[in-house]
Regions:
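Loop/turn elements at helix/coil->beta-strand transitions in domains of secreted/extracellular proteins
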Residues: 46-48, 77-80, 105-111, 141-142, ...
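Solvent-exposed loop/turn segments at secondary-structure junctions
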Residues: 56-60, 87-91, 117-121, 153-154, ...
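Sec-exported extracytoplasmic/periplasmic mature domains
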Residues: 63, 69, 73-77, 103-107, ...
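Extracytoplasmic/secreted envelope proteins and their assembly/folding machinery
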Residues: 65-72, 95-99, 111, 128, ...
Length: 217
């Protein structure tokens, strides 16, 4: 029993020490980010790939979106940013297809409005018919949208997401992957910030992302 108690004390001390040394501007592996054992190749050349795994219905993704959008603008041409709509269950597929259809139609101006409709106006956009009604109200041709929504290209991208989720072991959102190797999120960063507000955790996450991008440049 004494040995077990000592072991637990050592483990606890190690965790506390790592948390104490961690900071958003100088993040510590295992505290504010995780490293994927097998780094994945990227096709972004000298630029750093940044993936954000998200779900439209997720309130934390909605809260993260404004500051993330500003961060993307600030980083400019130093990164290639890609959003990845997760598909943890079959019921997620309509919103995955919604995102990729908007992307294919070059109508990403509606992306924020989808978040607002769900989290501000309390609209349910998890079924095809509701999605079609929504995009039509925003000036998108219903038939053209539906053709792309059901296209092989969109279906292929949805299938690719399942592979990415498994590769990066995504089990929650929002989660960010830097250059196929470093994984962080407001949840991971927040584990070192007891009692911090969601806004503070989001801000700290962006600082961690800055540091990880700099590490890869």
């Amino acid at each position: 029993m004494r040995f077990l108690a000592r072991l637990m004390a050592v483990v606890s001390f190690g965790f506390i020490a790592a948390s104490a040394m961690a900071s958003p501007t100088e993040p510590v592996e295992g505290a504010e980010y995780h490293r994927l054992q097998n780094a994945q190749p990227t096709d972004t050349g000298k630029k750093v790939e940044v993936l954000e795994f998200f779900w439209y219905n997720c309130p934390h993704c909605f809260a993260f979106e404004p500051s993330l959008t500003e961060w993307i603008k600030k980083r400019g041409d130093s990164i290639v940013f890609r959003r990845v709509p997760v598909g943890f269950r079959e019921s997620f597929v309509p919103q995955q297809k919604l995102y990729y259809t908007l992307e294919a139609m070059n109508r990403m101006d509606i992306h924020k409005q989808v978040f607002d409709a769900i989290h501000v106006s309390r609209q349910k956009l998890d079924k095809e018919e509701a999605i079609l009604d929504f995009i039509e109200k925003h000036g998108v041709d219903r038939k053209k949208f539906l053709d792309i929504y059901n296209s092989f290209g969109v279906q292929s991208k949805v299938g690719r997401v399942r592979q990415l989720q498994e590769t990066y072991r995504i089990d929650g959102v929002p989660t960010v992957v830097i250059d196929g190797q470093y994984i962080t999120s407001p949840s991971i960063v927040g584990s070192t910030m007891r009692g911090a507000s969601e806004q503070a955790m989001n801000a700290a996450t962006l600082q961690v992302m800055d540091a990880l991008v700099a590490k890869k440049k």
